[in-house]
């Protein structure tokens, strides 16, 4: 933990997507570590929003769209970062079907605008570009994907994030060699307190419990690499440190996911959480137009070996921490207190 704090103290960080769920947790942790965090993102899209509840102090903030190249360049100039953490994205599969063009321009063109701002930045940069576990060509064999697996994507979201990976690789090889240090981080199905996004399992269950209604599941048999938000965020920070230090042999792409024996179906999680929140039993309503894969798993051994990173939460532990956060918040506890408490407990184990 001392090493983590020593690295990030007073470090200038441009964090995109800081108003989102995962970005809000990252901003909070970076602030606790003493970093100077500059946020760039759209205004929060949910009510409530974790970003608004936490009120994390920032060194600077710009609420704008990644598709606005001038705004991205202005944010880079204002922040003068040493580290870039790129979280901002359209991150939902169902939303990518409703607006595929917006999904692609946000995820691919938006990232290219960031890469271009980095290309024209005067000082060397270290950047972690966060994509998703869904970048792989998924034949639903059940095998966990290593970083060397082919990229693909049948749905608009997955395809856009695979294309983002290709764009990052191109900019690194064409423009950044010997100057900027960049890696892509692949993780997904992140859970934790303070997520109110639409079309996500845990927030849907929380909302259903508040209404005393049944949550609707599209694919209860699907399995996902569920992980508590602090595990991948810890991985991203470790990755940025290693990239910045120029660690020999470090891969330019890393998976961050739970241990392979932690696979649990959507239906099992929904059953456990509806009971925990006292909500009615879930019901199944297939939506054929949403082409989500039923089986998805990541092989995160490379991150474990190269960064000495390990997921600290089991899936059940991640669920318990998530339930505790929402329960306490619904009972009147402050979001900042709950979030700081869970970050501190996580830090104590490092």
What would you call each of these model-derived segments?
Residues 44, 68, 134, 189, ...:
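Residue-level detector of flexible, active-site-proximal loop/helix-junction positions
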Residues 32-33, 64, 209-350:
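C-terminal substrate-binding subdomain of Rossmann-fold SDR/epimerase-dehydratase oxidoreductases
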Residues 1-187, 345-346:
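N-terminal Rossmann-like NAD(P)+-binding domain of SDR-like oxidoreductases, especially those catalyzing
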Residues 139-144, 148, 156, 162-247, ...:
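NAD(P)-dependent short-chain dehydrogenase/reductase
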Residues 69-70, 82, 94, 101, ...:
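Residues in well-ordered alpha-helical elements
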Residues 46, 54, 194-198, 262, ...:
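Residue-level signature of the cytosolic catalytic core of signaling kinases
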Residues 26, 50, 204, 299-300:
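Residues within well-ordered alpha-helices
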Residues 16, 66, 105-108, 157, ...:
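Short, solvent-exposed loop/helix junctions and linker helices
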């Amino acid at each position: 933990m001392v090493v983590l704090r020593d690295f990030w103290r007073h470090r200038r960080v441009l964090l995109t997507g800081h108003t989102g769920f995962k970005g809000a947790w990252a901003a909070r942790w970076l602030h606790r570590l003493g970093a100077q965090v500059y946020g760039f993102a759209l205004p929060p899209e949910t009510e409530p929003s974790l970003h608004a509840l936490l009120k994390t102090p920032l060194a600077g903030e710009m609420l704008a769209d990644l598709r606005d190249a001038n705004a991205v360049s202005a944010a880079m100039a204002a922040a003068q970062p040493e580290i870039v953490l790129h979280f901002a994205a359209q991150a939902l599969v169902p939303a990518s079907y409703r607006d595929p063009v917006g999904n692609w321009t946000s995820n691919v063109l938006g990232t290219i605008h960031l890469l271009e701002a980095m290309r024209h930045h005067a000082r060397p940069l270290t950047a972690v570009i966060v994509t998703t576990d869904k970048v792989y060509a998924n034949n639903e064999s059940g095998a966990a994907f290593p970083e060397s697996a082919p990229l693909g994507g049948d749905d608009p979201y997955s395809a856009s994030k695979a294309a983002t990976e290709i764009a990052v690789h191109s900019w690194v090889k064409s423009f950044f060699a010997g100057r900027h240090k960049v890696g892509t981080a692949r993780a997904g199905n992140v859970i934790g307190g303070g997520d109110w996004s639409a079309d996500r399992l845990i927030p849907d269950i929380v909302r259903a419990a508040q209404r005393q209604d049944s949550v609707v599941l599209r694919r209860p048999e699907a399995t996902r690499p569920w992980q508590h938000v602090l595990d991948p965020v810890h991985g991203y920070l470790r990755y940025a440190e290693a990239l910045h230090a120029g660690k020999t042999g470090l891969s330019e792409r890393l998976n961050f996911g739970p241990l392979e024996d932690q696979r649990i179906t959507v239906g099992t999680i929904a059953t456990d959480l509806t009971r925990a929140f006292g909500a009615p039993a879930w019901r199944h309503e297939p939506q054929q137009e949403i082409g989500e894969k039923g089986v998805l798993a990541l092989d995160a051994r490379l991150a474990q070996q190269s960064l000495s990173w390990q997921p600290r939460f089991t899936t059940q532990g991640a669920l318990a921490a998530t339930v505790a956060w929402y329960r306490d918040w619904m009972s009147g506890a402050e979001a900042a207190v709950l979030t700081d408490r869970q970050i501190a407990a996580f830090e104590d184990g490092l």
